[in-house]
Amino acid sequence: MTSVRTVSKIERLGSSLAALRRVALYLGVTIPLLPVQLVLIALHSPFARRLPRVYHRLCCSILGFDVAVTGTPSTVRPTLFVSNHVSYVDIIVLGEVIETSFIAKAEIARWPFFGWLAKLQRTEFVDRRGFRAAAHRDAIHRRLEAGDDLGLFPEGTSSDGNAVGPLKSALFSVAEDTVRGRRLTIQP
């Protein structure tokens, strides 16, 4: 015998109201922080590095994420944080744990709303076509020389996270660089 559970209208309404509440909280946090971050970037304030971490922490709280960290994130500046990319939630979760900007495909810069958020996090956008790889690698190196931590998903795409895909060597080669007179710190 098969059992089928019918979701009542009240349960659906409760779920919809909870989702609406989360969206309202998200917008209530995001909209006021946008101009603040814009000003911090314009003033070259060190807080322009810190505010995104506060923002991601608030987003994790709004979404109900309980983030557990195993190990200790590097505190050496600069650090290249390297990770598999499972979903866009990775940005929020990693952004809560580490004070970093990310390296992302150039198309994201043109996305409505989220492209703007990525720009305000000081994301380094890269064109995946090979002829621009050297220029992007140099831009990443300059950011590291300036002391910026960067997050890189070297597979260049998201996956289920169960296996490591082919690495996009042109950008990942920055890991071989000497930055500020020493080997670059890399943390998976």
Range-by-range predicted roles:
Residues 5-68, 116-120:
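A transmembrane-helix-recognition feature enriched in membrane-embedded lipid enzymes
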Residues 61-188:
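Soluble catalytic domains of membrane acyltransferases
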